[in-house]
Amino acid sequence: MGSLRPARMNEEELSPDEATRYRGIAARANYLAADRPDIMHAVKELCRGMAKPTRAYWHKLKRLGRYLVDNHRTVTRYYWQRHESEVTGYSDSDWAGCRVAGKSTSGGVIRMGSHFLNFWSRTQNHVTLSSAEAELIALVKCSAELL
């Protein structure tokens, strides 16, 4: 019977030329993420590796590139709303998602009717002791954005 250990990530650092290329492509993806909520979280995770990009980050960046090639026609359509719309907010968190620092990731979206007004995915500033605490911080962030 085989071992159920998680596969090791390739922690080999990229050469200086490859690291410069990685940073340039990740920066372009970060610019693109402002209009594409479907890639925002992935780009945020890729930008964590900007200081010392590794082969694992390079493979993740290539995977994002393949996703963008396959979904290049993804657009956000805004339709005329004939009725009054209410503003709603949704939030979620990933408790202790950062394996290095143990910090959680918060994400959320603010909508008015069917239109996106704002969306985000950010690492929380503090280490939380439970998933409920991480959710509460995400809820407070969403409430602040609504106001």
Where are these regions (language model features)?
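Divalent metal-binding acidic/histidine catalytic loops
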Residues: M1-L147
